Regions:
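Metallo-beta-lactamase
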Residues: 95-174, 237, 266-275
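Conserved beta-strand hairpin/beta-sheet module of binuclear metal-dependent hydrolase folds
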Residues: 3-53, 169, 173-188
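Active-site metal-binding loops of divalent metal-dependent hydrolases
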Residues: 10-12, 40-43, 68, 92-94, ...
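Cap/insert and terminal regions of metallo-dependent hydrolase folds
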Residues: 72, 87, 168-270
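Active-site metal-binding motif and surrounding structural segment of the metallo-beta-lactamase
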Residues: 45-95, 206-213
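Glycine-rich phosphate-binding "P-loop"
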Residues: 1-17, 157-167, 216-220
Length: 276
């Protein structure tokens, strides 16, 4: 099956004039006979960017929320207002309270900015599961990703409370898997579960060894140098053809990946399209 993945929301924009950037991520996954929206950004740029790129989101069959952070879910309400009710695939824990606490000095609420009841009232039809599942032809959600590597430790600045006492392990983090003739394509939100952990689960669950591409946020912009080193080693071992970094991959980690994988790494800014 063929897919076209277009980045609609990202921290940065590409060469297409008139598009807007914001801290967040959203990608439109188009396939024969339909389309799926993966994440929704913060809410300011999804609809304007889709319009600028001539993408009609009214025809989107469903929405996947990769996890319960504002910069991936904030555009859901504007989408529902503009395009009508949608089925929303998510982990049942996405509405948990979430905070970012940096240096024990400042606490920011970073959870979904709407309640579940409010979104249901706006037309969201939530389809919750924590399991690996098929949501369309050759399209799968990882569900909860087991943390098996020793070096992917998660973001130490994320908590379930304002005081920063209860770490948030982001168990709701999930990614989208597309099975293509070229191999697996992984669409990532933030990949809080770890890029290598997610790749290993994808291979195990689908039975496909070959990873053609990964696209989206990898959270490598928030990891230690040691974790980045180990991730580079693992990616090289998997022989991935395209590494398309967005959002929380960050500038420094993107520069490292571009150096380590010349011709294979691509900055996936707003407007970037991957066809497989």
């Amino acid at each position: 099956m063929k897919f076209r993945i277009t980045v609609l929301c990202d921290n940065s924009v590409g060469p297409l004039s008139g598009t807007l950037g914001e801290h967040g991520f959203a990608a439109l996954v188009e396939y024969e006979g339909g389309a799926l929206l993966f994440d929704t950004g913060q809410g300011k740029t999804l609809l304007p960017n889709a319009q600028r790129m001539n993408r009609d989101l009214r025809g989107v069959a469903g929405v996947v929320l990769s996890h319960g952070h504002y910069d991936h879910s904030g555009g859901l309400w504007p989408l529902l207002q503009s395009c009508g009710g949608k089925e929303v695939y998510a982990h049942p824990g996405i509405f948990a309270r979430r905070y970012a606490v940096r240096n024990r000095e400042r606490s920011l609420s970073i959870g979904i900015p709407y309640t579940e009841d409010f979104l249901r009232g706006q037309g969201a039809r939530f389809n919750f599961s924590e399991e690996f599942r098929e949501i369309g032809t050759e399209m799968f959600l990882t569900g909860e990703v087991p943390r098996v590597t020793s070096f992917e430790r998660g973001d130490s600045g994320l908590f379930c409370d304002e005081a920063g006492c209860s770490p948030d392990f982001m168990i709701d983090d999930q990614s989208l898997l597309l099975c293509t003739s070229r191999g697996l394509v992984l669409v990532l939100g933030c990949c809080h579960a770890g890029l290598v952990n997610t790749i290993e689960l994808a291979r195990e669950k689908t039975g496909q060894e070959k990873i053609h591409a990964v696209i989206g946020g990898s959270h490598l912009g928030f990891c230690s140098p040691a974790q980045l080193d180990e991730t580079v080693k693992a990616l090289r071992g998997h022989g991935i053809r395209k590494i398309c970094g967005s959002h929380c991959t960050g500038f420094a980690a993107s520069a490292r990946l571009a150096q380590e994988f010349p011709g294979q790494f691509h900055p996936a800014h707003v407007g970037y399209t991957l066809e497989v």
